[in-house]
C-alpha cells in the first residue's frame, strides 16, 4: 500500500442512478416490493434497466411525483398513503415494502422515514415498510444496495451463536457453491444478507463474523459492527486469488487448520488457473484504464494485473474506504495510480493521451470512446454477471477479453475493406 500512489480529484462526474440496484434486489427477494417515489424518468429507467414489461407485474413500481407535488400544491404524504394501500390490496403476497427515495423526492424533502414509520403503525406487522435512498445525487449506482441492506440490519434478531454472514447480493448458484465450500472447510453455520426471502433475516451478534462480497457496502458494514459483528479483513472474492484469500480469512477466524483449507481449495485453484490460461494469453501486456463508477475498480485491477497480466494505466474509484480496501491496495503493483473522485473531462483527456487498450467505464462514455477507436467495457455489466468465487475467475476474465476481441475483428474488417 505504501508504494501505491493515492490521488484525489473533484469536478464534473459521469454517474449512473442508484435506483438501478432495485433490478438485482427485487430478483433476490421475491416477497419484497420496491416502490420508487420519483418522477416518470425514474419509472422509465427502472423498467428499461430491468427489461421487464410493466404488464408482467414486476416486484417494483413508481409512485410518480407530479408537478403539483413538486410545487408543494398537493399533499404528497396523503397521495403516497393511497398508492401504498392500493398496492398492498392488489398484491397481498408482499411481505416487505421498500420505499425508495429518488432525486425528486429528496429535492422536495419528502421524509420517507416518517412515512415508513406511519405505515408500519397502520399495517401492524402484516407488511414491514422500510425506506432508503436510491438517489444518484451524491452516490454511485451500486450504493442503492448498501442503503437497502442497511435498512434491514435493525430488524435482524440478536444471537451470540458463532456463525459466518455473507453480506452482499450474489447469483444464487454462486452463493450455493460458496456455502458448500464453507461447509467443507468446517464452517457449518453460514447465512446471507440479503436473504432469499425478505422476512427470513439472519441473526447477528458478537459471535457473527462478516465477509463482505461487495466493496460498496460501507454503511451496512458499519451497522453490523454496531450490532457486535466482526468484519473480516480480506480481499474481495473476485478472481481465483482474491476468492481464496477471502475464504482463508473466514477459515482463520474460525480456527480451521491451514492444511485442511489447502486440501479443499488447491484443486479448485489448479482448475481455475487452467481455465484462465486462454484469456490470460489475450489479456497479458494489454493496458487498461478503469474509470470510477461501480466501486469494484480496485478489486478488478488487482485481478486483472496479478492473474491476467494486464498493465494498470489508472485505477479510478468514486470513493475510497482505506480500511475496507487495505487488503486490496496491498496487492496492487508498485506505483499504481489510484484516483479517488472524478473530474470526467480531465480523466477523458488522460485516456486520450495514454490510449489504453481497454477502458472500463459507464455506458454514457462508452460509445464516444468506441468512436475514437478505444475499446470499452461497461462497468454495470460486471454487477449483473456471476463473477464471484474461484470457479468464476475465467468467466470474469472473459468479460474483459471479449471487447478486445471485438475490436480486433473490427480492425481486421477495416483492413480488408481498404
UniProtKB/Swiss-Prot annotation:
InterPro entries the record matches: LIPOR_BchN/ChlN, Nase/OxRdtase_comp1, Protochl_reductN
Free-text comment on the cofactor: Binds 1 [4Fe-4S] cluster per heterodimer. The cluster is bound at the heterodimer interface by residues from both subunits.
Cofactor: [4Fe-4S] cluster
Keywords: 4Fe-4S, ATP-binding, Chlorophyll biosynthesis, Iron, Iron-sulfur, Metal-binding, Nucleotide-binding, Oxidoreductase, Photosynthesis
Catalyzed chemical reaction(s): chlorophyllide a + oxidized 2[4Fe-4S]-[ferredoxin] + 2 ADP + 2 phosphate = protochlorophyllide a + reduced 2[4Fe-4S]-[ferredoxin] + 2 ATP + 2 H2O
Highest taxon of the lineage: Bacteria
Single GO MF annotation: 4 iron, 4 sulfur cluster binding
Pfam annotation, one family: Oxidored_nitro
Subunit structure: Protochlorophyllide reductase is composed of three subunits; ChlL, ChlN and ChlB. Forms a heterotetramer of two ChlB and two ChlN subunits.
Protein name: Light-independent protochlorophyllide reductase subunit N
Organism of origin: Prochlorococcus marinus (strain MIT 9303)
Underlying gene: chlN
